[in-house]
Amino acid sequence: MSSSPSPFGQNEWLVEEMYRKFREDPSSVDPSWHEFLVDYNPEPTTDSSASENGQQTRTAAPKAPPEPAPAPAPKTPDSKTPDSKSQAPKQDSKPQESKPQAKAKPAESKSSTKPADAKSEKSGKSGTNGAAKPAAQPADDSDQNQVLRGAAAAVAKNMSASLDVPTATSVRAIPAKLMIDNRVVINNHLKRTRGGKISFTHLIGYAIVAAVKKFPNMNRHFAEVDGKPNAVTPAHTNLGLAIDLQGKDGNRQLVVAAIKKADTMRFGQFIAAYEDIVRRARDGKLTAEDFSGVTISLTNPGTIGTVHSVPRLMRGQGAIIGVGAMEYPAEFQGASEERIADLGIGKLITLTSTYDHRIIQGAESGDFLRTVHQLLLSDDFFDEIFRELGIPYEPVRWRTDNPDSIEDKNARVIELIAAYRNRGHLMADIDPLRLDSNRFRSHPDLDVLTHGLTLWDLDREFKVNGFAGAERKKLRDVLAVLRDAYCRHIGVEYTHILEPEQQQWLQERIEGKHEKPTVAQQKYILSRLNAAEAFETFLQTKYVGQKRFSLEGAETVIPAMDAVIDQCAEHALDEVVIGMPHRGRLNVLANIVGKPYSQIFSEFEGNLNPSQAHGSGDVKYHLGSSGTYLQMFGDNDITVSLTANPSHLEAVDPVMEGLVRAKQDLLDKGDTEDGYTVVPLMLHGDAAFAGQGVVAETLNLALLRGYRTGGTIHLIVNNQIGFTTSPAAAKSSEYCTDVAKMIGAPIFHVNGDDPEAAVWVSRLAVDFRQKFKKDVVIDLLCYRRRGHNEGDDPSMTQPSMYDVIDTKRGVRKSYTEALIGRGDISMKEAEDALRDYQGQLEQVFNEVRELEKHEIEPSESVEADQQIPAKLATAVDKSLLARIGDAHLAVPEGFTVHPRVKPVLEKRREMAYEGKVDWAFAELLALGTMISEGKLVRLSGQDTRRGTFTQRHSVVIDRKTGKEFTPLQLLATDSDGNPTGGKFLVYDSPLSEFAAVGFEYGYSVGNPDAMVLWEAQFGDFINGAQSIIDEFISSGEAKWGQLSDVVLLLPHGHEGQGPDHTSGRIERFLQLWAEGSMTIALPSTPANYFHLLRRHSLDGIQRPLIVFTPKSMLRNKAAVSDIRDFTEQKFRSVLEEPTYTDGDGDRNKVTRILLTSGKIYYELVARKNKESRDDVAIVRIEQLAPLPKRRLAETLDKYPNVEEKFWVQEEPANQGAWPTFGLTLPEMLPDHFTGIKRISRRAMSAPSSGSSKVHAVEQQEILDEAFAP
C-alpha cells in the first residue's frame, strides 16, 4: 500500500474546527465546505509519533483511569498495530462510523496543580461519590498545565511530525534596494490609476515561482509508496502562503493556503490569485481545496522583525522559503540617512531555504537562492512585471554605484532636469490604447544612467538651484517632481518657446502641485461623460446605420471643451466661437452649444428646419448653432457659437479666425489686457492637422497685426487614425502637432482616458491664452470606437488596433469605477445619473416621433431672399471728393514723403478737383466716402497697401523714419472734427491665399456692416483659395444660410505676362454662380468701379462681390472718368460707347455689335476709331452675374439694323465668360442672341501663351476677326 501525508498538513486543525462547527450548525460554515465535510472522518487530536516509514498511525482515545493520576504516555504502535476502529473504547453501542471521533473527548492528564472543575464536581462527574470537596487553590508560584486543543494541538502534532523530515537550511542575504525603489514606482503608478499595492512578498513569491522553473527539484517531496522511498514531482507548483490570522478570542493562528498552478501564471494573474487567497483567509472563506496540495511554502517572519529563521518543513513539501526582515547591515544601523546614502549602503533581506535533505541537496538549494537573488536584481524580471501591470516606464536598474564626486553629479542632475523639461513628453503615458504594450516610454536623455547616475544616488541630496521651490533635493524627490510634471498622463512641449517669461510661467504651473478636483467637480466631469456617451449610444440605437461621425472613444472631448468655456466665463470674456470638423459635431451641438435635442432628432427624421427651406441645405453634421453657457460652479455666463463647416477638413480654420476678429473689432477693446474677449476654440483631427496646409497658413496668421485674435485654443481629437491611414503614413514628425511650434505655442499631449487631466490642461490653456494672448494646442489622444462613419469596418485595415478597441472599456466606465473605488460616489449615484440623462433623450425622441410628418418638397432658390435695389443712389457730393483729395496732402508735420510717392499724392488732389480720375484713385474715393459715412472698411491682400502695380499707396511711409500715414483715416472724422464711426483698416497679408481669403470671408460673416475687401497679387493665384470659394463664398448662403458680402479683387487681363499672370478665372466663378449667390463684375471705367463698390456697401444685402480688376488699364489714359461720373451717375451694368450716349454717334448705321468686357474694350475702340467703322458698335457687359437681362435687351433694342452679333474676349474659347454666355445668352434672350458667335483665342489648357510675341499675334488676330469685313 502507498503512504502519504495528510493533504492539509499544518492546516488540519482548521479543517477539524470547520467540521466541529458544521456538526453543530451547518449554516455557520461557508457552503463551499459542505460537500467535503459531509463525509469527513477526522483523526483524534492526540499526540502520536510517526511510524518508521513516516506514516502517522491513528490511536483511539484511552479510557480515563479509575483514580486521578497523570495519564500515561501512549505506546507508540508498530507497523502491525490494528487500525483505530479495533482500538476504540466500547462505551457506545452505536456504530462508530455514525459519530465522528472528534466528538469524543480524549483522556485528560490530571494534576493536583489544576483546580477542579466546579461544574463537573456538582454534577457528580468528577469520578468520586458524595459531596464534592472544594479544591485547594494553587499557590501563586505553582506551575499550571493546560491541555492543548484545536489549533494548538494540531500545531503540536504537526511539529512533532515534522521531526521525521530530515531538513537542512541554506541562507542568503539579498540586496533589497532595487525591490524598494521599483516597488515605489509600481505603487505610485497604481495609486494614480486603478489603486492597490504590491508588497515585497508579492515580488519575492513570484521570483520563487520563477526560480522553481529552473530548479524543479525544489518543488518535489518525499513519500514511501509500497514501502519504497519515492521522490514525488507534482504536475505544478502550488505555492503555499503562510497567513497569520487573529481569531475572535485574540489568539493568533497560522494557516497555509495554496496558490494553485502558480507556475502557469503571469505576474498579474499571480497577484490576483495571491490577493484572493489572503482576502478569503481573512474573511473565513477559504475552502478545503485551498489547503490541500501545497508543494513549496513561503513564510515571512520578517514582518515582525525577524532577520533569519529556520521554519519547520511539513511532510508533503520539498522546501519552505523564509523571508527575513529588511534591514541595513547591523554595523550601519546607527548611521544617519545622509551617511548611509553617501556610502551607498542599502538594506538587505535574508532568505532561507529549508529543504528535505532526502531529495534536495545543499548545492541545489544554494543555486536556487542564488537564482532568486539574480531575478530580484535583473532587468528582465522587473521588465516583465512592469509590462504586466501596464506601467509604461522603464524600471529602476541595478547598477554599481558611480564613484564620481558629488560636484560632478550636481551638474548631471541639472542636466537631467533640463532633459525632462525638453523631452519628458516622450516618456509620458499619453496613449490610451498602448498598442505597443511591450515598449516602455523612454528616451536616453531621460535615463539617469545616461547622466552617470544610478539608484544609489536616489537618496543623495543635490543642489537644484530653486527647482520646485528648493535649493537642495534628493534625486528621488527630483525625479518624482519631474515624472509627475512631464511623464504621467500629460506630456508638455514648451521649451521651443523663445520668450523666457512664458516658459517660466508654464514651468511653475506644470512642476507645481496640482490640486485634485473636488468631489463635486468630479461628479460634474462624470455627468459630462455620461452625456457624451449616452448621446452617442442613443443615436446608435435609434438611428442604426445613419452617418453621424460619432465621438465614441473620444468622449473626454466634452468635459475638456466644457472646461475651456467655463474658464473663459471665469475670466468674464464675451464669447467662445467654436470651429470643428464633422466628427463629434452633433455631440458638441447637443452637450456644449445646447442645441435642442428635438431639433437634432428632427434632422435625423428628415424634417427640414423652416429657416432652411430655401437653398440646398446641408447634412446635419455640418450645421452651426449658438447658445449661452452657464457656469456650474460660478455666477458667470458666456455666449457660445459653433460655425458651420464643410467636409473639407480644416477649411473652416481661417474662416473662424476671421469671424472672431470681426467680433473683436466690433467690441473695440483693442490689443490690451482687457482685449480679445472673443475666444476661438478650434477642434481638429490628428491626420488633418498634420496633413492640411491651411493649418500652417492659419497658424501663421496668429501673431500678425491684421489677423491676430489674442490666441486660439486648439483641441486636437487625436484618434490615431485618418479614415484608414495610420499615423506612420500620415506624418513625418513625432507628433501631429509639431507644425504649431512655428508660432511658439505650448503643446499639451493628454491621455484621453484621463478626463481630470484633460480638464486641468483645458483650464491652464485658457489662463495662458489670457496672460500672453497666444495660441495653445491640446493634443487629446483617444481612439475611434467605430469606423470613419457608422457603416465602415475599420478592422479591414487596422485589425490589431481594433482588436484592442473592441475589448476596451469606455472612459465613462473607467472613470466611474475610479470614483467609486475612491469612495467619491456610489454605484447607485452613477447609474441614476446615467439613467436620468437617457430618460431625457428618450422623452424628446418620442416627442419628435409624434410630430406631424411633412411631405418633402424640392428646395427653393435663395435668390429671392435678397434682391439688389433697382434705384440705389451711389453718387456723392463733389465736396466730399475734394476732401478726400485734400487728405492725401495733409501729411503730418515733419513727415518726409518718398520723392516717387509725392507726385502721386499731388496728382490725386488735382484729380479730386479737376477730373480725369484714374482707377486707383476712384477706388480710394469709394472707400473714403464709406469711411466718412461711418463704415468700417477693411482692405487686405498681398502687397495691398502699396499695390502690386505701385498704384494704390493707401499707406504712405516716411522716407526717413519709417512712420506711417494713412490719408483715408482722416475721413473717420467729419469736417468739424467729430468722429464718424468709420475706420480704415488696411493690411499686407502673408503670402497666402487659402487662409487669407478664408479669414476675410469669416470677417465679413462676423461683421455684416463692414466693407471687407481682399485683393489677389494676381488674379491667377486665387485658385490657391479654391476650397474657400467653392465651400463658403459661392454656397455658404445656400447650405447654411450664412451670409457674407466679402469683396474679392482679382487683377485680370491678357498682357503677355505668361499663363500665371493673366487670368482671374472668370469661367470658374461663372460656373459656380447660381441663385444669385454672388455678384461678378468686370468694370471698365474708374467711375463704374466706384459705383459698384458703393452699391455693394449700401444695398443692404449680404452676398459676395467678385471684381476682376485691371493691370495695364491702371495707367491707360483713356481709362479715366470725369468728376460728374462720380457725382451724377450710378453703377451701370451695361455700357455703350460714349459716342452713342454722350456724342453724335448714329445707332442706325450699326450692323454689327461686339459684346465684350474688360480692358479689350479699349483695344476694340482704338481699332474702330482707326478704321472709322461706324457700322460696328461695342457694348460692354460690366456685370457678368447676375446677368442684366433687361438692361442688355433694352440696349440692343436701340440698334435696329443689327445683322450680326459677336462675343469678343481675349481669353481662350474654353475660358472667360464664353462657356457660360454661349449657353445662357440664347436661352435667356433668344430674340437677341440666337446665332451669336464667338471671337477669341482657341481653346487652351493654360490661360495664355508663355511668349509675349505669340500673345501679340493672338491679340491681333482677335481684333482682325472682330473688324473683318
Curated annotation (Swiss-Prot):
Region annotated 2-oxoglutarate dehydrogenase E1, C-terminal part, chain positions: 379-1269
Pathway listed: Carbohydrate metabolism; tricarboxylic acid cycle; succinate from 2-oxoglutarate (transferase route): step 1/2; Carbohydrate metabolism; tricarboxylic acid cycle; succinyl-CoA from 2-oxoglutarate (dehydrogenase route): step 1/1
Stretch list, region 2-oxoglutarate dehydrogenase E1, N-terminal part: 1-41
Annotated coiled-coil segments of the chain: 824-855
Keywords assigned by UniProt, alphabetized: Acyltransferase, Allosteric enzyme, Coiled coil, Decarboxylase, Lyase, Magnesium, Metal-binding, Multifunctional enzyme, Oxidoreductase, Thiamine pyrophosphate, Transferase, Tricarboxylic acid cycle
Activity regulation details: Alpha-ketoglutarate dehydrogenase and decarboxylase activities are inhibited by unphosphorylated GarA, and allosterically activated by acetyl-CoA, the main substrate of the TCA cycle.
GO MF annotation terms: 2-hydroxy-3-oxoadipate synthase activity; 2-oxoglutarate decarboxylase activity; dihydrolipoyllysine-residue succinyltransferase activity; magnesium ion binding; oxoglutarate dehydrogenase (succinyl-transferring) activity; thiamine pyrophosphate binding
Annotated InterPro entries: 2-oxoacid_DH_actylTfrase (IPR001078), 2-oxogl_dehyd_N (IPR032106), 2oxoglutarate_DH_E1 (IPR011603), CAT-like_dom_sf (IPR023213), DH_E1 (IPR001017), KGD_C_sf (IPR042179), ODO-1/KGD_C (IPR031717), THDP-binding (IPR029061)
Compositionally skewed regions (Pro residues) per UniProt: 63-75
A Pfam family per the record: OxoGdeHyase_C
A GO CC term attached to the entry: oxoglutarate dehydrogenase complex
UniProt-annotated binding residues for acetyl-CoA: 1079, 1095, 1130, 1133, 1183, 1190-1191
Stretches for region Disordered: 23-145
Annotated Polar residues bias: 43-58
Catalytic activity entry: glyoxylate + 2-oxoglutarate + H(+) = 2-hydroxy-3-oxoadipate + CO2; 2-oxoglutarate + H(+) = succinate semialdehyde + CO2; N(6)-[(R)-lipoyl]-L-lysyl-[protein] + 2-oxoglutarate + H(+) = N(6)-[(R)-S(8)-succinyldihydrolipoyl]-L-lysyl-[protein] + CO2; N(6)-[(R)-dihydrolipoyl]-L-lysyl-[protein] + succinyl-CoA = N(6)-[(R)-S(8)-succinyldihydrolipoyl]-L-lysyl-[protein] + CoA
GO biological process annotation, one example: tricarboxylic acid cycle
EC number assigned by the record: 2.2.1.5, 4.1.1.71, 1.2.4.2, 2.3.1.61
Cofactors that this protein relies on: Mg(2+); thiamine diphosphate
Annotated positions binding 2-oxoglutarate: 622, 647, 1061
Homology family: Belongs to the 2-oxoacid dehydrogenase family. Kgd subfamily.
Domain notes per entry: Is a fusion protein with two major domains exhibiting structural features of an E1 and E2 protein, and a short sequence stretch of E1 localized at the N-terminus, which is connected by a linker region to the rest of the protein.
Complex and partners: Homodimer. The 2-oxoglutarate dehydrogenase (ODH) complex contains multiple copies of three enzymatic components: 2-oxoglutarate dehydrogenase (E1), dihydrolipoamide succinyltransferase (E2) and lipoamide dehydrogenase (E3).
Function: Shows three enzymatic activities that share a first common step, the attack of thiamine-PP on 2-oxoglutarate (alpha-ketoglutarate, KG), leading to the formation of an enamine-thiamine-PP intermediate upon decarboxylation. Thus, displays KGD activity, catalyzing the decarboxylation from five-carbon 2-oxoglutarate to four-carbon succinate semialdehyde (SSA).
Protein name: Multifunctional 2-oxoglutarate metabolism enzyme
Lineage of source species: Bacteria, Bacillati, Actinomycetota, Actinomycetes, Mycobacteriales
